């Protein structure tokens, strides 16, 4: 990964790791038991063949606690989409989330990358996977889906042409193409995952896109997605895109569906 993204991901990951290591010292983690359905869903996902062990998806030992935190069948995921998209650093997540990430990359992320840059995504930078903690770092509130390996925070994308797109820089201050790419990836995530949060949703998600599979919005449809984005970005504006610290000049669109 490029130096800028590497420093970003490493720096933010250190903070996330500290939370994961020490977040369970107090809070609502040591009472109750992990819901049995979680382990059953993990097992069904693996036995159903949604995800297979490989050089980039490695089974790990069961994570049992502290408290309700953990996974029955955790995976160390260093690559997605048949290994064509590197995950940096490798993520500790469950099978259901791994399968959903594969689908999202195939149906939303790669088509958007080809459409706006004529290049495919080869790496995503994540800053939080499994971690025993509460939502938004509040250990006395509701337990985060990160505590069950059922969530991932994505901070950056790297393309095959060398371009790096970080959520922190490009969401608000990126070129029209960068913003359109992130909007398309975000909108696609809202169809694939149950909870999706990005910059503008609250002060905790200013630098990443959070995705998880917890059904939190059953009364109003199954998906909770914030912020709500306006549809479309006029690509005519992209001809004069200014250079940013996270971008190179976009290439003409040559991906699937090009005329």
Listing of model-derived features with the role each one plays in the protein:
Residues 1-24:
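Sec-dependent bacterial lipoprotein signal peptides
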Residues 9-14, 28-34, 54-56, 210-212:
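Short, intrinsically disordered, charge-biased short linear motifs at domain edges
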Residues 18-44:
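Bacterial Sec signal peptide processing site at the extreme N-terminus
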Residues 27-31, 60, 64-67, 75, ...:
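Catalytic cores and adjacent binding grooves of peptidoglycan-active enzymes
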Residues 37, 44-125:
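Active-site acidic/histidine clusters and adjacent loop/turn architecture
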Residues 115-149:
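Active-site-adjacent substructure of cysteine-protease-like catalytic cores
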């Amino acid at each position: 990964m490029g130096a800028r993204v590497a420093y970003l991901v490493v720096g933010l990951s250190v903070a996330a790791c500290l939370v994961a290591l020490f977040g369970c010292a107090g809070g609502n983690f040591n009472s109750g038991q992990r819901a049995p359905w979680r382990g059953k869903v993990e097992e069904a996902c693996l036995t159903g063949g949604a995800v297979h062990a490989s050089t980039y998806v490695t089974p790990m030992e069961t994570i049992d606690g502290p408290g309700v935190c953990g996974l029955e069948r955790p995976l160390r995921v260093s690559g997605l989409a048949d290994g064509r998209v590197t995950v940096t650093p490798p993520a500790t997540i469950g099978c259901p989330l791994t399968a959903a990430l594969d689908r999202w990359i195939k149906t939303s992320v790669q088509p958007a990358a080809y459409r706006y840059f004529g290049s495919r995504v080869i790496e995503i930078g994540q800053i939080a996977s499994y971690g025993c903690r509460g939502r938004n770092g509040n250990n006395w509130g509701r337990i985060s889906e990160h505590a069950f390996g059922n969530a991932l925070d994505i901070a950056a994308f790297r393309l095959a042409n060398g371009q790096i797109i970080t959520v922190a820089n490009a969401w608000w201050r990126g070129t029209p193409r960068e913003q359109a790419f992130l909007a398309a990836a975000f909108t696609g995530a809202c169809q694939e995952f149950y909870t999706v949060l990005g910059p503008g949703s609250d002060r905790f998600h200013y630098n990443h896109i959070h995705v998880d599979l917890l059904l939190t919005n059953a009364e109003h449809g199954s998906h909770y997605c914030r912020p709500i984005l306006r549809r479309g970005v006029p690509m005519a504006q992209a001809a004069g895109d200014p250079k940013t610290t996270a971008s190179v000049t976009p290439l003409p669109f040559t991906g699937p569906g090009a005329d």
